[in-house]
């Protein structure tokens, strides 16, 4: 079967702008994008690459990522975008686990590749040789290798918040369904424009942005590295139709000196994903009359639920309903559906859900209940079938035998005007098993912040839900995908307690 859809897209939209690199001020049409991929496919074949070989790229948002993606689609090779925020040992572990054959890289990040087999370092994407290989002016058409829908197309490694990163597998079928589901849900067409600021090693940038926009014939604007001020300038210049980012990125754009709410109001969709919805984001943008929509997905099941613009005004914290061709249910610990309004684990069944983890059959089996992926997220559904995320199941704090949802504590804490941002975690306690601590970024210096916040929290929550520690931080620790690093924050709290013993 032929999954070389970029060739089909180029036949219909040959001269339409497909990709614009903002940093290089260079653009490519769909015809040129396909020509680059054809040329790269020929090159990979000349290097002995065969169907099933894993080809990696270690680079910021760059046209080379798309060259290799579509060349892999044409040759049957497996595409692996690597997270350049990881440290050398983490990268080496992924490279070994994935059984990588060749690695393309950006020279700027070469220092992070010291621990891998240096024979795998194939080519710097910024050298003249690379440009000569993919030059669309010298197009060599490539006959795509036949593949089956269930064949492995890509590996994307999780951020490893609960242990070592796992390789999430994507088949050709799951990739195409991912793009098509979102394309149909959002009614994307060739007039759509978006800026890709989220790194393309992340499903939010790759599966949820690149795939649906290019499948619909739209235009991608590449931001090489995210910067809030630069993004605001890019929005003013390119007038995107929609944008999708994680909460920390919205904070940065909002607080940049050049933030212009009118540029955001002009968009059809402004989507918050990649992390639990934050009320503070909605509230901050709402004061400018900007409506932020919540979406939901994870590496194993990219963007499978999303709210609508109208419904998000009535239910701003809902992640909405399942997108087209997705079945979402709330299950108890026995795998049975819970009644409406009750909390259970969100489970997803869809063609775009991963078939499992690379070389990890036991972990794959634990991740599924029948054909439903168990997301690890606690959720509930209301009478309108709108879904609300409550918290991560594994992040539930059990203190003195009582269950405490960190999100409930965070939401109450965020209501106080002193608190800019906060993350709540459990830490080890000799009497209660776990106790509650909050890492907070304060809006202003206040020597009595702990007493003030404690009084505020006790007026809103039961005593056992109130943090025993409030720890101010200047910057919230973030993991490699720029989400709050709760493992690091928990360790910070445990270290702080041990120093006082």
Task: Identify the residue ranges that each predicted region occupies.
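ANL superfamily adenylate-forming
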Residues: 108-149
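Conserved ATP/PPi-binding loop(s) of AMP-dependent carboxylate-activating enzymes
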Residues: 322-325, 336-367, 402-404
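Conserved AMP-binding/adenylation subdomain of ANL enzymes
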Residues: 176-193, 201-242, 252, 256
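Conserved AMP-binding/adenylate-forming
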Residues: 42-86
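Conserved pre-ATP/AMP-binding loop-to-beta segment of ANL
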Residues: 14-15, 139-157, 164, 187-193
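Gly/Ser/Thr-rich phosphate-binding loop
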Residues: 240-245, 254-314, 327
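AMP-binding/adenylate-forming catalytic core of the ANL superfamily
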Residues: 86, 103, 350, 355-356, ...
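Conserved AMP-binding A3 loop
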Residues: 27-31, 153-177
